[in-house]
Amino acid sequence: MGTRYPEEGDALLAPWLTRHTRDELEALALEHNLILSPLRRIDEVLATPQFHHRGLIGNTSMDGRSYAWPGLPFRVSDRRVQSEPNLSGTLLSRCLPASSGAEHAHRIAASKADGLPLAGLRVLDFGWVWSAPWVGTMLGEMGAQVIKVEHGARPDNVRLSGRIIRDGRVVEGPNREMSPMFHQINHGKLGITLNLKHPRAVELAMGLVAQSDLVIENMSPGSMERSGLGFESLRAVNARLVMLSMSAAGQFGPAANLRAYAPTMSAFAGLESLVGYSNEPAIGALNFALGDPNASLHGLLAALAALSRARATGEGAYIDLSQVESLVSVMRPHLLSAQRSGRQP
């Protein structure tokens, strides 16, 4: 409606929107699962209740002063690691306990002998759209076997986003198999369809879990648990399993049920406020979906670190990644600059 009938849409929505404050609209969106988020300024980001509830915001010292500083955008087995402005190379070692590394070195050597560093690794990908599926694809490009799990009646909706065009003409073929975006995000994967409301499907999924190294998902918090596939259930059949959950705002906190697309996540995190001109309203990043691939790269980093530790120790891990926190992570220079100067970047 906003694209085809923008004036009519504004006429319907604007009067209602102006009757509410920004905080009221955010509360209504969270209560009713609406895809809406406030556009936070940089000076508001560090005071966001969701970030403090999850322990994202810590402190660092510089030039004799203390500044609020965000940690990494994920918790590993319910542990948060804080990052330092000058830290390099050792960040994840503070979150993942050290090990002897002997088995790790042996397994890595064996994998390299197969040609790719992650050969022999199996990943179950319950993700949809972009952020989680792209983690699986990058792991597949490094040699992992990735199995995409979909619901037969409700497949990944990216399957229906556009058609292949060749020489100016739409290429004919099955609707679900002809999306260039789907193949870009999911190339190289095996696939299986499971109706997880059926007990036999859950049984089959658990059989795959028992033979896998990593499970990835980006559903709303609680979705996997309601299907009988929460981390505690999965760990019972595979103690070495790593699970990566990538919801919009993390698995807990006052905004945990945030429903979002990439632009609304960018607004929630304050990134949209950086796009514009001085003394004018923020333009925002419009429809540029930075939130998805940015979360994918953070998820990949966390998953590789946890998998490395699992190979060395035999202990799995649960990774609770927040996609909006991943956006805050790339804004650290602006957050520090705003505190030092007292001005909005």
Label each residue range with its predicted role.
Residues 1-157, 162-171, 234-244, 328-345:
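Acyl-CoA thioester-binding alpha/beta core of soluble enzymes
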Residues 15, 160, 207, 299-306:
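Alpha-helical scaffold segments in soluble metabolic enzymes
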Residues 5-6, 183-187, 280:
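Short, flexible turn/loop "capping" segments at secondary-structure junctions
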Residues 128-129, 197, 288-292:
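Alpha-helix N-cap/helix-initiation motif
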Residues 65-89, 171-207, 265-273:
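Redox-cofactor-proximal catalytic regions of oxidoreductases
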Residues 63, 75, 135-142, 211, ...:
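Active-site-adjacent "lid/gating" segments in soluble enzymes
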Residues 152-155, 220-221, 249:
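Acidic glycine-/aspartate-rich tracts in secreted/extracellular proteins
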Residues 18, 112, 124, 171-236:
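A structured beta-alpha segment of the ubiquitous adenosine-cofactor-binding alpha/beta core
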